[in-house]
Amino acid sequence: MENVVIVSAVRTPIGSFNGALSSVSAVDLGAIVIQEAIKRANIESALVNEVIMGNVLQAGLGQNPARQAALKAGIEKEIPSLTINKVCGSGLKSVALGAQSIISGDADIVVVGGMENMSQAPYLLDSKVRQGVKMGNLTLRDTMIEDGLTCASNHYHMGITAENIAEQYGISRQAQDELALRSQTLASQAVQLGVFDKEIVPVMVKTRKGDIIVSRDEYPKADTTAEGLAKLKPAFKKEGTVTAGNASGINDGAAALILVSESKAHALGLKAIAKIRSYASGGVDPSVMGLGPVPATQKALKKAGINLDDIDLIEANEAFASQFLGVGKDLNLDMNKTNIHGGAIALGHPIGASGARILVTLLHNLIEKDKKLGLATLCIGGGQGISMIVERL
């Protein structure tokens, strides 16, 4: 079976909600990382066989946002593109689909990744407007909440699924806040030290006062304290434990990687960062969707023929502190090797991009720490999880 190698991995900075990147569409963010990933891979765009990009909040973006991003990035019109939606797992599923395409022999080089601008998610009128409204009020529907952050099976916010896990596992408010503080501290230190600079492509943003360059993550809060977190009110249940401080953010950003068959990489003289060892998805009850990484990781480890102890570094998406801690309990995650520079609670969670983003960060962390095996994993709204294991070369 043909090995699949990764020859470049890049992301934009992550912007805060209505922040520095809010005026840059998901399509434009996607185009920026696609173009930069190709540049860093040192290949001609004409050699690309397909572009696959995750994107969740597609309402109003137009047909096939991945196709739009590819064309804006300068990809030739003859090269096809696919947009996929697996909620928070979209960006990592795009990598798995690209790998499958190469393994099957359908492609040699695939651009994969994810893109999201949650700040630009539109509001919708009810569909009955098409039949005519004779009287009464109309309610606008927030596509960000409805299509991105609401459990379609149980009709409640993702935050309630985090509360469910906290109750099921007896995870205290203090434990959640302690994880949030860890994430903020590590991420803020990493930003200050420029740890993420090598994985980030700066974004030029046009403003009324002229062009500005956004080159660092906007969301981490260096002034976060335990006392400040403790003062925050529960966000989803009156007597709950999940707050805005121990949950991930609402954010904008994109990430992309170039996948190449090992034989093609050798033929072109490309330097591979890593090879994909395995990937897997799993399902859990939608009411505790945050536990999805558990079966997904167990399956991925089995496919790779290794144990979790063999993994050197882990990037586990922090959708919610309680969710992360529940997964940590079930998998017995070693915190010394997990989210070593913070996670989504501090960095942010642009949902369609996050799967690719954590893989990009994982790859650069493996290089930084001179480690070999890495695991990337995310929970997925609706009750799923996705995991991928890579081996640095």
UniProtKB/Swiss-Prot annotation:
<dbReference type="InterPro" id="IPR020613">
    <property type="entry name" value="Thiolase_CS"/>
</dbReference>
<dbReference type="Pfam" id="PF00108">
    <property type="entry name" value="Thiolase_N"/>
</dbReference>
<feature type="active site" description="Proton acceptor">
    <location>
        <position position="379"/>
    </location>
</feature>
<feature type="active site" description="Acyl-thioester intermediate">
    <location>
        <position position="88"/>
    </location>
</feature>
<keyword id="KW-0443">Lipid metabolism</keyword>
<dbReference type="GO" id="GO:0003985">
    <property type="term" value="F:acetyl-CoA C-acetyltransferase activity"/>
</dbReference>
<protein>
    <recommendedName>
        <fullName>Acetyl-CoA acetyltransferase</fullName>
        <ecNumber>2.3.1.9</ecNumber>
    </recommendedName>
</protein>
<keyword id="KW-0276">Fatty acid metabolism</keyword>
<dbReference type="InterPro" id="IPR020615">
    <property type="entry name" value="Thiolase_acyl_enz_int_AS"/>
</dbReference>
<dbReference type="InterPro" id="IPR002155">
    <property type="entry name" value="Thiolase"/>
</dbReference>
<dbReference type="InterPro" id="IPR020617">
    <property type="entry name" value="Thiolase_C"/>
</dbReference>
<feature type="active site" description="Proton acceptor">
    <location>
        <position position="349"/>
    </location>
</feature>
<comment type="pathway">
    <text>Metabolic intermediate biosynthesis; (R)-mevalonate biosynthesis; (R)-mevalonate from acetyl-CoA: step 1/3.</text>
</comment>
<keyword id="KW-0012">Acyltransferase</keyword>
<dbReference type="GO" id="GO:0006631">
    <property type="term" value="P:fatty acid metabolic process"/>
</dbReference>
<dbReference type="InterPro" id="IPR016039">
    <property type="entry name" value="Thiolase-like"/>
</dbReference>
<dbReference type="GO" id="GO:0005737">
    <property type="term" value="C:cytoplasm"/>
</dbReference>
<dbReference type="InterPro" id="IPR020610">
    <property type="entry name" value="Thiolase_AS"/>
</dbReference>
<dbReference type="InterPro" id="IPR020616">
    <property type="entry name" value="Thiolase_N"/>
</dbReference>
<comment type="similarity">
    <text>Belongs to the thiolase-like superfamily. Thiolase family.</text>
</comment>
<keyword id="KW-0808">Transferase</keyword>
<dbReference type="Pfam" id="PF02803">
    <property type="entry name" value="Thiolase_C"/>
</dbReference>
<keyword id="KW-0963">Cytoplasm</keyword>
